[in-house]
Amino acid sequence: MGEELLVYDSVEICFNGRPAVRDVSFSLSPGEILCIVGESGSGKSTLLRAAIGLLGRAGMVTRGDIWFQGENIPDLPERRLQKIRGSRIGMIFQDPAASLCPVRTVGSQMTESLRAHGPISRKEAKERSLALFDKLGLKGGERIWECRPFELSGGMNQRVGIAMAMLLNPCVLLADEPTSALDAVMGRQAVLELLALREHFGTAILLVTHDMGTAAAMADRILVLKDGTAAEYGPAGQVLAAPKSRYTRELLEAVPSLE
């Protein structure tokens, strides 16, 4: 597997015995951004959640392997997966409400996240969080720390979600449609912040999107999914400039301009 951090090898995922993803293989290297692109229902988010064992009771990896730093994720007990989540693999959800309690302060939630992986004082947690806010360009860190998510905009909550996911400096970040609930301006801001994570921390990012334009702006490699199978996979420049799949060409035609 060489330098690869995350390797999906001929993966099949079923829900209640029915395949949602079939025979999908790809890998993610340190510092790389890999975008998984496809329409709703193609299996993108399912692939992402499988990397941290969040398929729910009905979901199961029924064939293949998902290797992360020498460990096969489908074989790991829940206790081991809990150690990996956050500290080694972080995740940004499509809806910030999925990861933030609306009535507890951002500071209390960030402190709790840090304490789940080791003892830390509230003062130390605040210092670490404010330093991260500053690196990510979030102005007014003190105010954000004291706010409850319902007092912040959707765009700011998404940015807080990015900060939460990076608290423990994981080597891999999973991002599930991080721009889909944002307007165009905030969507561009989220893209820039994700690119900054790689620049500042060397984070490898596995990003799910239905928007080929977002993939064009970010990806080193692209995996195109259609009905749970890989329609195309390769370097972003190659997939964008000379797509082999008709489905990939259709997705590209839906993007007004990649300039």
Language-model regions, residue ranges each:
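A short, surface-exposed alpha-helical micro-motif characterized by mixed small hydrophobic
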Residues: 215-217
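Conserved ABC transporter NBD signature motif
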Residues: 60-72
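The feature captures the beta-strand-to-loop junction immediately N-terminal to the Walker
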Residues: 37-39
